[in-house]
Amino acid sequence: MIKDIIKKLTERQDLTKEEMTYLFDNLMEGNLTDAQIGAVLIGLKMKGESVLEIETAARIMKEKAVKVVVKDKSKLVDTCGTGGDRLNTFNVSTISAFVVAGAGGKVAKHGNRSISSKCGSADIMEALGIKIELTAEEVSRQIEEIGLGFMFAPLFHPSMKNVIKQRREIGVRTIFNILGPLSNPADANYQVMGVYDKSLVEPLTKVLQNLGVKKAYVVHGLDGLDEVSITAETYVGEINESDINFYTVKPEDFGLKRAEIFEIQGGDVECNKEIALSILQGKDYSSKTDFVALNSAFALKVIGLVDSIKDGIDLAKETIYNKKGYEVLEKLRNFS
């Protein structure tokens, strides 16, 4: 059957649910050769992955993941993006997670070490003194007790080990770059998902809705950011239960001054750690804090802690300058 699937992909035909299920079951179980893995990943990429293909693959990844049980999901949000924007910004979605938790939300943060940037979410968490190699039970306790838990992707998606080598050897983005944010082990009902290409916003919004997410924002900054941009307009896909809307926003809509890209760029792990500490300790009054507040606001709005993005920015800044986000960081450092 795998040869038939490869043939179909070379003819740029979409796979059926049954074919995609067969393919990903065998892919994740390590039953395909390196050549077959390379062929199907490039075949899907060249054809363009359909909503059904992405949704089916995401369901299989979630089924095979180590589950994190969170009893109260009423304000549980995931802020994981695809990464890969190559603009070298600091870790805004990770810093936003501390802010959202400090403001009263619960964040199931899902991430990995750097692949395309100098500093991934796992790298910055470690640099900040937070233990990332935790069991599912420990992450569940972090979320319940502190409001933020970090799930280090390799530990919660062990079957991914069967494709790591091939993905590195291929060296281009594949379906796996978008599956991470769609396969949160805590199964959060709310999500803010940044994507590296505008063309992904609409299909991934539909995928999230099909996967049962209650409310979500899928965002792409038109400057290339996989975040809500402070330097340009942002294309947004919004899920509100059964409704989907697509629209564009800009920083000025929320009373923020537009920044230049160099103002929000980071560097290596040490540099990004210092930026994170400066913001969370309430010492930064630059566009970097505006950038964090803007992205935090979308998460605060999606879980219903505020009624508008502008109110979310105000709450995020209040949380930052009252050092409530930094308190979350200290609790995670001391977690045992």
UniProtKB/Swiss-Prot annotation:
Keywords from the UniProt entry: Amino-acid biosynthesis, Aromatic amino acid biosynthesis, Glycosyltransferase, Magnesium, Metal-binding, Transferase, Tryptophan biosynthesis
Binding positions (anthranilate 1): G81, N112
Binding site for anthranilate 2: R167
CC annotations in GO: cytosol
One GO term of the biological process aspect: L-tryptophan biosynthetic process
Enzyme Commission number, as recorded: 2.4.2.18
Cofactor requirement: Mg(2+)
Stored Pfam families: Glycos_trans_3N, Glycos_transf_3
Family: Belongs to the anthranilate phosphoribosyltransferase family.
HAMAP family hit by this protein: TrpD (MF_00211)
Subunit note: Homodimer.
Function: Catalyzes the transfer of the phosphoribosyl group of 5-phosphorylribose-1-pyrophosphate (PRPP) to anthranilate to yield N-(5'-phosphoribosyl)-anthranilate (PRA).
Protein name: Anthranilate phosphoribosyltransferase
Source species: Sulfurihydrogenibium sp. (strain YO3AOP1)
